[in-house]
């Protein structure tokens, strides 16, 4: 049986996390991949457009991002994450999940922060420098 698209996307997130960690602690700390890995449980919600309940662990992961590195939500707003993992993540659905399903409040200025290229958004991941 072939893996589901959600499983494959979670695998891609895991690969990105490992790649960031391979760049050393500094690389992992300056990227959003570790934070966004917390979204893995939410992938079925994005895949099933009729879903009204968050999968187990999804809201806890979102809460961790909102409280820790909310600026990493810009990778959803700017569609960087969906291009990286190949799963459609509509911004309106993501914020409905945050507010209506998980009862979380993203920072009020998150959209303008994301639109401002100088907003200090860490990259999704970074590639380690080649060894000499």
UniProtKB/Swiss-Prot annotation:
Residues 1-27 form the signal peptide. Keywords: Disulfide bond, Glycoprotein, Lipid-binding, Secreted, Signal. Coiled coil: none annotated. The keyword Metal-binding does not apply. InterPro entries: Bifun_inhib/LTP/seed_sf, Bifunc_inhib/LTP/seed_store, LTSS. GO terms for cellular component: extracellular space. It comes from the Eukaryota. One of its GO terms (biological process) is pollen exine formation. Belongs to the plant LTP family. Lipid-transfer proteins that possesses lipid-binding activity in vitro. Involved in the development of lipidic orbicules/Ubisch bodies and pollen exine during anther development. May be regulated by the transcription factor UDT1 in developing anthers and play a role in tapetum development. Positively regulated by the transcription factor TDR in developing anthers and may play a role in tapetum programmed cell death (PCD). This is Non-specific lipid-transfer protein C6.
């Amino acid at each position: 049986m072939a893996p589901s698209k959600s499983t494959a996307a979670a695998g891609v997130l895991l690969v990105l996390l490992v790649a960031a960690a391979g760049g050393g602690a500094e690389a992992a700390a300056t990227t959003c991949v570790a934070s966004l890995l917390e979204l893995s449980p939410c992938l079925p919600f994005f895949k099933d457009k009729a879903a009204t309940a968050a999968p187990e662990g999804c809201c806890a992961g979102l809460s961790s991002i909102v409280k820790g590195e909310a600026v990493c939500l810009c990778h959803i707003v700017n569609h960087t994450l969906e291009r990286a993992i190949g799963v459609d993540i509509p911004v309106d659905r993501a914020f409905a999940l945050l507010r209506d399903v998980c009862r979380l409040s993203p920072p009020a200025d998150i959209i303008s922060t994301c639109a401002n290229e100088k907003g200090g958004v860490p990259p999704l991941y970074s590639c380690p420098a080649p060894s000499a």
